[in-house]
Amino acid sequence: MSRPTRAQVAAGRVLIVGDAMLDRYWFGAVERISPEAPVPVVRVNREEERLGGAGNVALNVKSLGAQATLLTVVGDDEPARKLRGLLEREGVRAVLGSDPQLYTIVKLRVIGRSQQLIRVDFENQPDHEVLAGMLADYERLLGEHDAVLFSDYGKGGLTHIPRMIELARAAGKPVLVDPKGDDYTRYAGATVITPNRAELAQVVGQWLSLIHI
């Protein structure tokens, strides 16, 4: 199979569906230990916000030259507005559902002396299928795209993924899945599944060398 040309990649239209999040970074100087507990005191002097999760996947697709559309659900909160602004700035088309019961996922990393000191996660586990109300949007978007990429971070946004894969295959679209968890039967019908080494070991167990896979 030949590698696609740059022109072919640029002409591609990819629909990314999954768990989007906002990555926040606080950078600062560490000059002393807190008198309250044996932890460093970080004097923050710079903050950054970046696309995370499925948002970062969409950004990577865009950086390859393809057209990227992100379909996801976020909360009705300040991080959601930040996320929307970042997507707009990066040229990623965003179809964002808003769920007032959901916290937009934020991962805050505090960096001092060029190393990460702590990560704080802000999220809540939804008690309902957050993308269920967007299946009509998903079906409509299928006709406008050449492929579907599911970015599963296990945050509850892809409970309906078997149905979504079924709809994509019925529409003749290749399906790529970045998986999470140990139940890959959920991804039945996918064209390609791309676990990393740790994710694959979670499913098939540890191996000594590639010949054991």
PLM features: what roles do these ranges have?
Residues T5, R13-V14, L22-A147:
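Conserved N-terminal subdomain of the carbohydrate kinase-like
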Residues L15-V17, R119, A147-F150, L176, ...:
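Structural motif
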Residues H145-G157:
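Short acidic, glycine-rich surface-loop motifs adjacent to enzyme active sites
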Residues L200-A201:
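A generic structural signal for short hydrophobic patches within well-formed alpha-helices
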Residues I211-I213:
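Conserved small/polar residues in nucleotide/adenosyl-binding loops
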